[in-house]
Amino acid sequence: MRLLKSHPLLKLVNSYLIDASQPSNISYLWNFGSLLACCLIIQIVTGVTLAMHYSPNVLEAFNSIEHIMRDVNNGWLVRYLHSNTASAFFFLVYLHIGRGMYYGSYRAPRTLVWAIGTVILILMMATAFLGYVLPYGQMSLWGATVITNLISAIPWIGQDIVESKIITLIINLSFIAILFSIVVVYYYILLHVNFSSNLPTIGVIHQNALKKSNKALRLDKQEYISIPSSFLAFLAGLVDGDGYIQVTKTSKGFIAIKLVISLHLEDLSILEYIHSVLKIGKINIYKDLRSPTCKLVINKTDLQEILFPLLMYNKIFFLTNTRADQFNLAMYIFKNDIKMYNQIPDNTPAVFEIPKNPIDYTLLPFFKNWIVGFTCSEGSFFIKSNNDGCFQLKQRIHTNLFEAFKLMFNTNRKIDTTNNFNQFGVSSKSDIQKVINFFSFSGLHPLVGLKYIQYIKWLNNLRESLRYSTLNYPDAK
């Protein structure tokens, strides 16, 4: 293993500067942050060097500057580098802020990163101001007086601060410069945790894989970020029901990873809808099988670059144990850049923790939209032979998850666990009304494909039924 990844200190540096998660198709607009870091390093090094020879005394300042320019080795270069880098610092920081405002860097989950960046800007201006007001600096006496007196606007204590020696003490100790550096370090820590305002690629993608993928059809990374979280929650529910993440071994012992959503051919419109939003994956149709099917297959590169980063960005995850385990395994392989199948460990850490009890499922912000996706794969709306309306969800044993359905639909109906399957079903008038209210909620992702048609027909049959005719139905569209 390389020293960068084994040494305790170098491992930290490597994770921040070399292996930090960043998009593979990042633009030049994301260079301003690294350029500003270079400017900060230059300012600190040249500033400390100048401070060794500069005297802030009015009587000695001019002579100390001449000493730097004439006697210090390359002193003229250090002085001009310090002053010109200061100008470049502000020029780049305004471009950096403009890029952040244009791409929405102030939005969650990077709100705190943006707030710390604002603090850095204020400290940066304060530090620059202290440099300008030094004897033989670039600011006039009256200009410095006006800016200093801004502090007097602070209620109750402002005037005392201006008249006291506190500001002089701060200048002499270079306190603001020290605080500025500390805040910058904290800013980079937050940026490492919350990523930049673009989708980070998970792990390392080989250049050959990037060449093979058809990027011409893809959206811009910023457009992917704008995809509603309701759609991603719907997709997670659909995958939990009728999808799987397949990790297989190639003939040469390498790892192959893909995500597959398999539906009946009549539900082809669902896959076409997903493909139209994500612009990734390939739809395959199998008409020769006993039960004609269609499959959306998303390859490893698209999982690393698009889908998994989107789920991580929106804090959406799979809620069935099987799918969660598959996701954790794939994420571990991506993050650790594992190439060979025999290098996969027996146990992998969980990226997200599945709720331990039913109530915790209902507290997840994406759970309602997840139910819609799960309904499109494992749900059904039908009329029984006795003309009772029924809504049903069915899958293999996931006890806590199905108990959460009871809480979400506010019903006391018992979960049927026959033949190692969980079955949640309601048919009473009050329960059917709750189901109608749930799927009629305006903020919910709609049902899609054949399940939507089934739901509309189900509503029409309920309206015509004597038993359910008095229920409140959504307006017909």
UniProtKB/Swiss-Prot annotation:
Outline the segment boundaries, as ranges, of region: Maturase. Answer: 164-477
Source organism, top-level taxon: Eukaryota
Which cell locations does it reside in?
Mitochondrion inner membrane
Q: State which residue ranges cross the membrane.
A: 32-52, 86-106, 113-133, 142-162, 166-186
Membrane protein topology class? Multi-pass membrane protein
Q: Recorded GO terms, molecular function?
A: electron transfer activity; endonuclease activity; oxidoreductase activity; RNA binding
Q: Which UniProt keywords apply?
A: Membrane, Mitochondrion, Mitochondrion inner membrane, mRNA processing, mRNA splicing, RNA-binding, Transmembrane, Transmembrane helix
Please name one Pfam family that this protein belongs to: LAGLIDADG_1
Primary location class = mitochondrion
Q: Which Gene Ontology BP terms does the record give?
A: mitochondrial electron transport, ubiquinol to cytochrome c; mRNA processing; proton transmembrane transport; RNA splicing
Q: Where is this region: Cytochrome b?
A: 1-163
Give any Gene Ontology cellular component. Answer: mitochondrial inner membrane
Q: Which InterPro entries match?
A: Cyt_b/b6_N, Cytb/b6-like_sf, Cytochrome_b_N_euk/bac, Di-haem_cyt_TM, Homing_endonucl, LAGLIDADG_dom
Q: Which PANTHER family match?
A: CYTOCHROME B (PTHR19271:SF16)
Question: What more is known?
Answer: Encoded from partially processed cob mRNA that terminates with the in-frame coding sequence of the third intron.
Protein family according to the UniProt entry: In the N-terminal section; belongs to the cytochrome b family.
Tell me the function of this protein. Answer: Mitochondrial mRNA maturase required for splicing of intron 3 of the cytochrome b (cob) gene, containing its own coding sequence.
Tell me what this protein is called: Cytochrome b mRNA maturase bI3
Organism expressing this protein natively: Neurospora crassa (strain ATCC 24698 / 74-OR23-1A / CBS 708.71 / DSM 1257 / FGSC 987)
